[in-house]
């Protein structure tokens, strides 16, 4: 990366966009989401097919927290991993990178991921329609679960965003 590219990258401070999560297997269905992200954190709002906000997700480089708005339940990282096995192999910082259009690092030989998980997981990242790294396909052979996360639109710009107001939603 040359100095000009580094300078441009430093100026990009905010990313937002929309996408869709499609799942089959343990959980079948499709939900839309929107996101707002800084380089070190992200806020994701998931809506059901009729447009109701159903799940709010906060990601930092090391942690995930989610709130189910229908059941008024809050989940920490370990509970999220049980509900969404994809999060066993995609760390929160990698999820943030994906929202920015950067390649997610998943190493099948990563010893920090249990062998049983590594043997049964297939994760592929693809680009589509001019959007870099906009599709994440996950397949768990053991659970016969497929999850596809697709970014439909992504805006990256120099505007500053303050995610503090979104973090306050955790406290209700």
Regions of interest found by a model, annotated:
Residues 68-71, 112-172:
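Non-transmembrane domains of secretory- and envelope-associated proteins
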Residues 9-10, 34, 53-57, 124-129:
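Short linear motifs in intrinsically disordered
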Residues 1-36, 166-172:
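N-terminal leader/targeting segments and the immediate start of mature chains
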Residues 81-122:
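Extended, positively charged loop/linker patches that create polyanion-binding surfaces
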Residues 13-19, 27-35, 40-46, 55-57, ...:
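One face of beta-strands
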Residues 41-93:
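An acidic-aromatic
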Residues 27-29, 51, 119:
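Residues that act as N-cap/strand-start positions at coil-to-secondary-structure junctions
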